[in-house]
């Protein structure tokens, strides 16, 4: 049976039809399977805690190589929340370095900062996959991101043309994030938008997951 892959969620499940990647903060206990990172929202703590950056990076490094952790993130830049851009960019770059050192993909949080994300990608030339979660922008921006090797994960709200582009280029992921929707229902909705059978969508994303991390094969 081909499972449903939920690449980014804040809801843990024991459903055997679903393989979900639970997002955890750097200071939370890891579970299998999970992503661990320093969310841009948390960077605001650096404004009042001079040790926040060094401490959070150290804690993330300690967890990053664990078998339960299959990705680093959420990491990224948020122009509306968190610390100033200089602090956010420093913490983002440090997390990119960690992802590269442990050879694991990066889950990206991006709010009104696509140009900055692309700039970091071009400057650092990372070898590990980058997945931008919660993608809602248009096809033109999707084409720009995919052109720079950034994959896209779609929640409940998405641009259909961007979705189709991501599917056709094998850069598509699906997620529930903080939403209460069942990932199976989400797959059904997306398959309908793509005008394909849901089993075809499941198989495509599962094959991508198997290439992303062998951990998906061990579940």
Residue ranges and their predicted role:
Residues 1-219:
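Mid-domain alpha/beta scaffold segments of enzyme catalytic cores
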């Amino acid at each position: 049976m081909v499972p449903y892959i939920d690449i980014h969620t804040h809801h843990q499940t024991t459903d055997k039809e679903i393989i979900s990647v639970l997002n955890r903060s750097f200071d939370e206990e890891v579970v299998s399977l999970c992503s661990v990172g320093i969310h841009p929202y948390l960077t605001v703590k650096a404004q009042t805690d001079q040790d926040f950056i060094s401490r959070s990076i150290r804690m993330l490094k300690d967890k990053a190589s664990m078998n339960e952790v299959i990705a680093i993130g959420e990491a990224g830049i948020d122009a509306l929340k968190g610390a100033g851009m200089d602090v956010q960019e420093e913490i983002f770059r440090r997390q990119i370095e960690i992802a590269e050192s442990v050879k694991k993909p990066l889950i990206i949080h991006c709010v009104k900062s696509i140009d900055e994300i692309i700039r970091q990608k071009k400057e650092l030339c990372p070898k590990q996959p980058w997945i931008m979660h919660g993608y809602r922008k248009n096809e033109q921006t999707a084409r720009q991101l995919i052109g720079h090797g950034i994959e896209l994960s779609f929640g409940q709200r998405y641009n259909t043309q961007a979705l189709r582009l991501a599917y056709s280029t094998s850069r598509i992921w699906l997620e529930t994030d903080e939403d209460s929707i069942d990932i199976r229902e989400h797959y059904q909705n997306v398959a309908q938008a793509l005008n394909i059978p849901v089993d075809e969508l499941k198989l495509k994303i599962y094959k991508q997951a198997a290439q992303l991390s062998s951990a998906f094969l061990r579940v």
